[in-house]
Amino acid sequence: MNTNKKELIPTVRQLMELHVNALFTHDQSMRLRAINEPWPGEAEAPRFFLGRTTEGTALCRFRHDVPEQLVEQLEGLCSDERIAADIEAKPKHLEDYMNLLQGERFTMGPCFLIPAYAAPTMQVVGLNRETIADYVLGDLQWLEEEIDYVQPCVALVLDGAVVSVCRSVRITSEAHEAGLETVERFRGNGYAQEVVAGWAMAVRQAGCLPLYSTSWDNHASRSVAGKLALSFYGSNFTIY
């Protein structure tokens, strides 16, 4: 990708569409099928997804087994949602969604675009099947099993050991979602934002947009977003 070329920034509505398309696989009717994990296996998608943008638009998707009559009811409620100005604000019709779907639980959180100017200030390294053997994984030993599926993968290394890593955990041809892990005893040192910035650069070099989302009660993850001044475009909400 030509990094000197001016980036065409999608609208917040387009970003939300890229986000939901990265999170889940869809059938031809754009109904949700499964969680779009890059590694083998297929976890079932939620019954309902609602994306509320900072411009006041709402995007909703439904799992393939939600009856059409119920879909119509839910779509009517979605069209009446508020602007997602507050990261922690719950959907206006949360109780109605839960009751209509007989939901067992819901998830909710902010969604960000990592801007093109984000860049690491410390040295980070790319990890793949060939290079991962050069480093001690320690508490991140599980990374060896998934390394082939989560490219690009960027790490911060101290004394030969990987202490923080950001990799692609949801992938489409247009956008990647970040998956961030830092060894507990190394948290609070700014390493997380370094690997996120390095990962975002690698994703852009592959011709895709780097997206970052988390849950509203994950204060550590939200802190990373704040320190990197990520671009908040909306909030997601799912019901299982």
Which residue stretches match the model-derived regions?
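Conserved GNAT acetyl-CoA-binding A-motif
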Residues: 59-61, 174, 203-215
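Internal catalytic-core helix/loop-beta-alpha segment
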Residues: 121-154
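Acyl-donor-binding surface of acyltransferase catalytic domains
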Residues: 2-134
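Conserved acetyl-CoA-binding loop of GNAT-fold acetyltransferases
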Residues: 226-236
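Conserved beta-strand-loop-alpha-helix junction that forms the acyl-donor binding cleft
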Residues: 212-223, 238-240
